[in-house]
From Swiss-Prot:
Pfam families: PMSR (PF01625)
Protein's name in the database: Peptide methionine sulfoxide reductase MsrA
Superkingdom of source: Bacteria
Role noted for this protein: Has an important function as a repair enzyme for proteins that have been inactivated by oxidation. Catalyzes the reversible oxidation-reduction of methionine sulfoxide in proteins to methionine.
EC code: 1.8.4.11
Amino acid sequence: MNEITDKNLPTLERATLGGGCFWCLEAVYQQIQGVKSVVSGYAGGARPNPSYESVCTGATGHAEIVDIEFDPKVVSFRDLLEIFFVIHNPTTLNYQGNDHGTQYRSVIYTHSDEQAKIANEVVQELEDSKIYADPVVTQIESAPTIYPAEDYHQNYFQQHPHQGYCAAVVAPKLAKFRAKFKSLIAPQYA
């Protein structure tokens, strides 16, 4: 019988990202090898325990986010950010496609000084590359309190792949990810 010690357990990290509707981000990050969990939620606002309805008004200040738990020995924070900047438009202030409001802002909530450094480096590399005609408006902030979204928002695309928004918006982002990052797709999704 093998002894279970802390040395045998992976040291997991968190990444918290907002870039439009959380259903899109959740669907992508769930398919990445090394990602252990993805929770759709809200962060960055003043009201504790916000509801979807209150966040949708734009009055709470929260962003729709995904809180990702990952094994950095399998997938790096930089990898997660490179995916992030491919699957959403970081140059549009407070909207993605037809989703408008501060709750859809592009934001990276960091959980360490190292994550903040990497996030700033990746944004600077994007700016220097001139991939986008407009400046990157992604906010980089220390992670605030994160509130999980309601249960019906969790695993949304997996449960409703043919729902209108999922078919029109989420599926194309997922396809874009799968085409560009084949080596990062978890075996069960390959």
